[in-house]
């Protein structure tokens, strides 16, 4: 390269460098402007948030000091940045002058020493001479590379120009690394990155982290709706008008009729009289034909005769009846009547108007099928079944089009209510809520989900609970949710269906029990085969030909094991348990329903709600451990007007099951069983009863579950067991006085049971709040109670229990004064008391009732301690 060429390049290079400096200055000015705008936005948002916090708490000096410190650091950063920019501009001007002289020397040296290869500016980094390293610093090499690469290939986009274009377009920089390569002068770019990181990282990372946490928490949480009178669209509830023949019935005749229908017991005020015929309900002709001709329900069952008039009168109801008694129709007919009387859904409304909650998928699908029988001819009422394990996309599309009735499990309904920030469906028009198998809903731990759902429904709704049992936990929930409910109980002393013939066998070991199972199956199908051997007779009586069997076992593993053993004997049952995929469970259940003389092997997952009328035999292979479980398991046969058998297979050590059988079996059933086996069963039952009196055994009262409540129960049981062992050791150490101590313990127990429990002194005041809402406050005096009782009533676990059960606020107030002392002036604190606050008076009264239960437990502890201390 000649000297003339070098001299011609130098002015061109100087021009390019000048243009780049101008672009660089413009870019920095633009970046400084954008940074200041971003910082201003970030300052205003935290300032608004901070101001809102300050209005709530004016003493939040810590937050204010942090804000001022941040603003001070930001101003300091801007000042340093301006100083760096000025220094850098001066340095660039000096470097520009040196660049021309250095490039001349460099080009001459390259022409003399590198004739074997052509040198380009892309190869300048490969030179190893000391002069080149000393002559150029890093910034000059980078600039020269970028300049020459630009001249070498004009088609390539300049990185700085691309970066400037992205800023002009309002976007973010394309790549931060490009900016680093171009502007890596004296560490300026690093300082800018550090300052940017300082200004953005703290707030951005912290806010994003809190957003993620809050979003995860709120993901499955339904927002409570605060209703006002203006928001509530009025709707009719009462549609029932007593016919003349019912009106003329006297109270004695009504009681006699209730006894004749299975011992109907009614609790509550102003309950309508029961009906005896469908025509007394005033149903439309098409519904009457469906009930009497298609469904072949000639007359109402016991629960239907009393529950339907009560619900159609607009009352909240708790229905307690045996399984297979027709509870589903008891709430379907009133729900359809109420929905038909309301305004139809508009184009912008999704519904629903009626909501039915069920504990399991199978029961929800079954209820939906029953509802569709009544709505298939009526296009104005649309239904949908929302359960887990099924495709949600189709459910969402159906819900968007609008539905009048939703049948769902609580978990899937929570998922739907939280979709799209709760905007998918609206619960404002729900006026009728049903909880079927309510006790099972609570046993499975759905109470929190149901409580969330009920907070989104209008308070003047009509709510109905149906169940086969009514435990205390469900009772307290019903007191919170239902308004002045009626309780209808059908034959509460004997919940086993009258159409079920019960029997049992006691076997010595598992092998004998399995052989007994095979003999039962062989005998059953042999008899059934003889009955249906004639094909013409089979066509005439199809019900006799299809005899299905359900075998209940205790666990998934045992279910699979028993299936393998039965398969070796030529039986191929369909198996269903929670360990199988949902689609396989549905398919096996459908095959069981459609296949003649089929066998179903399952766990207790299907002990409730399964309705297959052709089931004529239920075999309880692993004996039920609770009475409720036995009731529901035997209820899978003898559905409606059909008859069926229930056989229990026992082992000698299953004492609890023998105790349940003794209470459940009727005299006519005992007379048909081997007398020796009946005697063995009674002895096992007596052993269990005596063990319960001694504290050795305890009969379970529910299906169990997990959670804190169950852990507390287990802990108490363990403590009682350890206490029993300790008492037994004490008795063994003093054998001469064993008989005396037994008598003493009996008398002690009677003394404790005969303790009179004092009623708590309390007053309830009605308060009107600033926002015109009404609240109730109760003052309960606990100062004068015995010490242990006072501790029991005021300890934290008691207060948290009451708050959880009732939703009321309960706090300790005042000061404890010994007996005979009290406050002497108005300045002194009052005697120790509990203050209970709630929105409803019934919630406050329920809190006091639960508190009295805790006081009763405390009184018994006091008496027991005093008796035990004076025993010796």
UniProtKB/Swiss-Prot annotation:
Protein name (database record): Pre-mRNA-processing ATP-dependent RNA helicase PRP5
GO cellular component: nucleus
Source species, domain of life: Eukaryota
Ranges of biased composition (kind: Acidic residues): 182-205
Bias kind Basic residues: ranges: 102-115
UniProt motif (Q motif) ranges: 276-305
Compartments (UniProt record): Nucleus
Compositional bias of kind Basic and acidic residues: 10-21, 61-101, 130-147, 709-731
Organism of derivation: Vanderwaltozyma polyspora (strain ATCC 22028 / DSM 70294 / BCRC 21397 / CBS 2163 / NBRC 10782 / NRRL Y-8283 / UCD 57-17)
Function: ATP-dependent RNA helicase involved spliceosome assembly and in nuclear splicing. Catalyzes an ATP-dependent conformational change of U2 snRNP. Bridges U1 and U2 snRNPs and enables stable U2 snRNP association with intron RNA.
């Amino acid at each position: 390269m000649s000297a003339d060429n070098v001299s011609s390049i130098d002015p061109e290079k100087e021009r390019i460098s000048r243009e780049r400096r101008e672009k660089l200055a413009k870019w920095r000015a633009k970046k400084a402007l954008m940074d200041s705008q971003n910082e201003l936005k970030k300052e205003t948002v935290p300032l608004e948030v901070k101001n809102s916090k300050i209005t709530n708490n004016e003493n939040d000096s810590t937050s204010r000091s942090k804000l001022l410190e941040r603003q001070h650091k930001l101003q300091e950063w801007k000042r340093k940045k301006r100083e760096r920019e000025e220094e850098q501009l001066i340095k660039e001007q000096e470097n520009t002058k040196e660049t021309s002289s250095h490039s001349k020397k460099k080009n001459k040296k390259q022409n003399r020493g590198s004739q074997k290869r052509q040198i380009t500016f892309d190869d300048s980094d490969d030179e190893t001479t000391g002069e080149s390293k000393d002559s150029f610093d890093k910034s000059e090499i980078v600039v020269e590379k970028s300049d020459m690469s630009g001249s070498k290939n004009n088609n390539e986009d300049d990185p700085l120009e691309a970066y400037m274009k992205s800023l002009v377009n309002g976007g973010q920089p394309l790549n931060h690394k490009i900016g680093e390569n171009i502007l890596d002068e004296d560490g300026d770019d690093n300082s800018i990155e550090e300052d940017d990181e300082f200004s953005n990282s703290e707030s951005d990372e912290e806010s994003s982290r809190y957003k993620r946490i809050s979003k995860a928490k709120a993901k499955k949480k339904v927002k409570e709706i605060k209703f006002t009178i203006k928001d509530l669209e009025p709707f009719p509830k009462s549609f029932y008008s007593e016919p003349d023949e019912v009106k003329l019935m006297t109270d004695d005749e009504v009681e006699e009729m209730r006894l004749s229908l299975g011992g109907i017991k009614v609790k509550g005020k102003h309950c309508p009289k029961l009906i005896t015929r469908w025509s007394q309900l005033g149903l439309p002709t098409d519904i009457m034909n469906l009930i009497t001709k298609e469904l072949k329900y000639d007359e109402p069952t016991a629960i239907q005769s009393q529950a339907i008039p009560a619900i159609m009168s607009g009352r909240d109801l708790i229905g307690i009846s045996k399984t297979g008694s027709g509870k589903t129709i008891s709430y379907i007919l009133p729900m359809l009547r109420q929905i038909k009387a309301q305004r139809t859904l508009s184009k912008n409304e999704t519904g629903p108007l009626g909501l039915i909650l069920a504990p399991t998928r199978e029961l929800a699908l079954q209820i939906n099928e029953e509802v569709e029988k009544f709505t298939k001819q009526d296009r104005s009422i649309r239904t949908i079944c929302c359960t887990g394990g099924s495709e949600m996309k189709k459910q969402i599309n159906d819900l968007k089009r609008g539905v009048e009735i939703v049948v769902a499990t609580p978990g899937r309904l929570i998922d739907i209510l939280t979709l799209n920030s709760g905007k998918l469906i609206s619960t404002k028009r729900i006026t009728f809520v049903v909880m079927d198998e309510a006790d099972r809903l609570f046993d499975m731990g759905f109470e929190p989900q149901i409580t969330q759902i009920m907070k989104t429904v209008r308070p003047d709704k009509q709510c109905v609970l149906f169940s086969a049992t009514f435990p205390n936990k469900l009772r307290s929930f019903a007191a919170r949710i239902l308004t002045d409910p009626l309780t209808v109980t059908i034959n509460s002393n004997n919940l086993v269906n009258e159409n079920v013939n019960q029997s049992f066998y006691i076997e010595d070991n598992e092998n004998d029990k399995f052989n007994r199972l095979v003999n039962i199956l062989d005998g059953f199908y042999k008899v059934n085969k003889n009955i249906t051997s004639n094909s013409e007779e089979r066509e005439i009586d199809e019900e006799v030909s299809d005899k299905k069997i359900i075998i209940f076992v205790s666990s998934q593993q045992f279910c699979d094991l028993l299936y393998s053993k039965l398969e070796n004997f030529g039986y191929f049952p369909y198996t269903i348990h929670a360990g199988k995929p949902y689609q396989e469970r549905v398919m096996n259940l459908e095959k069981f329903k459609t296949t003649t003389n089929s066998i179903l092997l399952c766990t207790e997952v299907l002990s409730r709600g399964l309705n297959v009328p052709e089931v004529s035999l239920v075999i309880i292979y692993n004996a039920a451990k609770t009475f409720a479980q036995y009731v529901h398991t035997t209820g899978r046969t003898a559905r409606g007007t059909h008859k069926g058998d229930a056989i229990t297979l026992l082992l000698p050590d299953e004492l609890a099951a023998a105790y349940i059988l003794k209470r459940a079996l009727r005299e006519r059933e005992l007379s048909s069983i081997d007398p020796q086996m009946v005697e063995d069963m009674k002895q096992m039952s007596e052993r269990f009863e005596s063990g319960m009196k001694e504290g050795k055994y305890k009969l379970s009262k529910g299906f169990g579950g997990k959670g804190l409540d169950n852990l507390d129960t287990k802990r108490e049981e363990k403590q009682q067991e350890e206490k029993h062992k300790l008492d037994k050791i004490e008795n063994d150490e003093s054998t001469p006085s064993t008989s005396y101590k037994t008598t003493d313990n009996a008398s002690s127990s009677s003394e404790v049971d005969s303790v009179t429990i004092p009623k708590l002194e309390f007053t309830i005041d009605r308060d009107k709040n600033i926002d015109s809402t009404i609240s109730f406050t109760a003052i309960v005096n606990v100062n004068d109670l015995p010490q242990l009782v006072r501790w029991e009533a005021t300890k934290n676990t008691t207060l948290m229990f009451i708050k959880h059960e009732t939703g009321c606020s309960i706090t300790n107030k005042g000061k404890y004064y010994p007996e005979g002392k009290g406050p002497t002036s108005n300045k002194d604190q009052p005697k120790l008391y509990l203050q209970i606050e709630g929105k409803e008076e019934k919630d406050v009264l329920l809190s006091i009732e639960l508190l009295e239960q805790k006081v009763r437990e405390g009184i018994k502890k006091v008496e027991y301690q005093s008796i035990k201390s004076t025993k010796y």
